[in-house]
């Protein structure tokens, strides 16, 4: 199976799940899809930064904590600040990872702790922000636009880069990325944003494209 076919299949699955979660306005579907994103995203982060290689159960616990953070912030965004007490167990988790780090290798402790906390912010934290947009029907289209534009940027960058790519964007970090691919992704993201929000808001597509590219390089 070619890389293009794989990207098309997974891209269609990704878009389909996101559309179902955001357009059906069914809280259960939304929570399942985005909770799955939080779990898998945190798990993948652990793989990327090589945390808990000797303790795989910690990966599961950290990924589950990201899902809980997403759920708790959804309840607060949906029902009000009175439900902020739902964050208490998550505060307990943060205390746990601080204590846990004490029993790690002393030399690696600061680095490992920073990786875990940043992963929670990078995945669980940013997905939790989505709750602010989702619970407000007037701004939920912005949330949809962000995810569709990210997919459009990735697809446009791949198609342009694989066919026209000549000038490397950042070869020391990502040898396959090119300026042509970046421009292709930028155009695709701007078009997607313009179609969903109106052309006067297409600057959002520029921001999304740049942020997505930097995120990949990071």
State where each predicted segment sits:
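Membrane-embedded alpha-helical bundles of polytopic integral membrane proteins
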Residues: 1-178, 182-206
């Amino acid at each position: 199976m070619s890389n293009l076919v794989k990207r098309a299949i997974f891209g269609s699955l990704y878009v389909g799940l996101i559309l179902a979660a955001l357009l059906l306005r069914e809280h259960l579907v939304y929570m399942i899809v985005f909770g799955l994103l939080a779990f898998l995203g945190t798990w993948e982060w652990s793989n990327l930064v090589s945390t808990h290689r000797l303790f795989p159960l910690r990966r599961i616990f950290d990924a589950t904590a990201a899902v809980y953070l997403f759920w708790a912030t959804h309840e607060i965004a949906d029902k009000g600040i009175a439900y902020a007490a739902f964050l208490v167990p998550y505060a307990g988790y943060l205390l746990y990872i601080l204590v846990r780090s004490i029993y790690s290798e002393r030399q690696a402790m600061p680095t490992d702790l920073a990786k875990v906390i940043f992963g929670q912010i990078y995945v669980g934290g940013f997905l939790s922000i989505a709750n602010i947009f989702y619970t407000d029907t007037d701004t939920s289209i912005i949330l949809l636009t962000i995810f569709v534009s990210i997919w459009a940027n990735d697809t446009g960058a791949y198609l342009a880069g694989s066919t026209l790519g000549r000038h490397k964007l950042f070869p020391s970090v990502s040898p396959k990325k090119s300026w042509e691919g970046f421009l292709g992704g930028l155009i695709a993201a701007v078009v997607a944003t313009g179609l969903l929000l109106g052309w006067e808001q297409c600057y959002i597509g520029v921001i999304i494209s740049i942020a997505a590219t930097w995120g990949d390089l990071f």
